Amino acid sequence: AGGHRVRVVGNLDDAQPADVVVVVNPNNPDGQTYSPGVLISWAEKLAAKGGLLVVDQAFTDPTPELSLASKADISGLILLHSFGKFFGLAGLRLGFASGNQETISLLKRKLGPWAVSGPALEIGARAYGDEDWATETRSRLARDRARLDQILSENDFEIIGGTDLFRLGAHEKAGQIYHLLGEAGILVRPFPDYPKWLRFGLPGNDVAFSRLAAALGGLSGE
């Protein structure tokens, strides 16, 4: 943590009296969100005492109304962006930070050059410029998220939250379900500190949805 004293809190209101606050918005894995207005207020309060708000927007692209991109020039704010989550090209290894000129200049001096390949820059620029694809993908993800929620609910999962890219559910037999799904070739994420939780990525197509539904249905029938 670079010599900083780090405190992990579950709610932004509990972050006082920190000078630097890092918020993942939406949060992974529970999908907790804060409105742009709340985050801007925090950035202004922190900037007034020489502090900084860092907002990780890795999972914001499906819900652009949560993005602070249009406010990136205010003092005391750094936004972190991840290309691979929304565009499905994690191997491209492309991400970036945005903020006002003074903040970004300071960040560049502290971090030094960060290598990004030419193909990654070209693919990223084209992808971010394809607004029609982004609009259609957001609609599809919202539909698929609702479809996944239905499958999980039908198999006795409590939907805790998530985003339009993944869902977090709780089940009394989560540990057993994790192993049996793995044997069926379906990988989900467990949480050792929360043994009832499983995180599900959105199935990629109708066949994958059917496989998941059949696997969970078979488990519940045992």
Where do the model's predicted regions map?
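PLP-dependent enzyme catalytic core of the Aspartate aminotransferase-like
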Residues: S35-G37, E183, D193-E222
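Conserved PLP-binding catalytic core of the aspartate aminotransferase-like
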Residues: A142, L152-A184, L202, D206
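Active-site phosphate-binding strand-loop segment of PLP-dependent enzymes
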Residues: H4-P62
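Helix C-cap/helix->beta junction micro-motif
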Residues: G2, A48-K49, I74-S75, N155
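Hydrophobic residues in well-ordered beta-strands that form the structural core
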Residues: V8, V55, H81, V188-P190
